[in-house]
Amino acid sequence: MLMIHSVANGLNHFCTWVMRLAYLNVLWILFSLAGLVVFGLMPATAAMFTVAREWAKGNTDAPVFSVFFRTFKKEWRASQILGLIVVTAALFLFADMRIAAQMDQPVLVNVFVSISLIFAFVVLYVFPVFSHFDVKIREVLSISFFIAFSRPAVTLLMAAGAVGVLCLVLFHVTFLLFFSGSLLSLILTKLSFKAFRSMDQRQEKEKAA
C-alpha cells in the first residue's frame, strides 16, 4: 500500500508540473501572437521567466496569469530594448559569418563561430538575469557575461538543457506547443539560481560593510 501511495503521489506531482508548464507555454505563445510576435515575443518571454523564477524560489502556488500579465505590462519597453540588442547582435554575427564564408576565409569563419558561441552562452543568462535583478539593461548584459564565464559548469549544463529542449521540440510538435518555452525557462532559471544567490549574498555583505 505504501508503495502504491508513493507512486500515486509521484504521478500526481508529475502531472501537476506538466499542466503548469503547458499553461505557461500557452500563455507565452498567445501573448507573443497578441503582439504580432515582433511586439509580443520579448515581453512574453520576460513574463515567462518571471513565473519560472517564482517556481524556482519554491513559490509554486503563485498566480501564474497575474504574475505573467503584470510583468508583461511592466517590462514591455525594457524587454523590447533588450530583445532588440540581442537580435541585432545575432543578425550581425550571422551576416559576418556568411560574408566570411563566401569570401572563403576559414580563419575569419572560425573567429566568428567562436564569438557566436560566446554570445550564445551569454544569451542563456539574459532573461534569467533580467527577471532576477533590478538593474539597467547594460548591467543585464554585463552580469550575464560575467556569470557565463565565472560559472562554466553551470553554463555548460544550461547549454545542454537548451539542446535537450530543442531535441524534444524537433521530435514532436506537441513539445513545441506546450513545453518549448516554459520548460527551457524553468531549466535555465533553476540552473542559474545558485549563481544568483551567491551574487545576492555578496551584494548584501558589501551593503552591510
From Swiss-Prot:
Topological category with respect to the lipid bilayer: Multi-pass membrane protein
Segments traversing the membrane: 21-41, 81-101, 107-127, 159-179
InterPro entries: DUF624
Pfam families xref list: DUF624 (PF04854)
A GO-annotated cellular component: plasma membrane
Main location: membrane
Subcellular compartments: Cell membrane
Key words, A-Z: Cell membrane, Membrane, Transmembrane, Transmembrane helix
Repressor in keyword set: no
Disulfides per UniProt: none
Protein name in the entry: Uncharacterized protein YesL
Organism: Bacillus subtilis (strain 168)
Gene name of the encoded protein: yesL
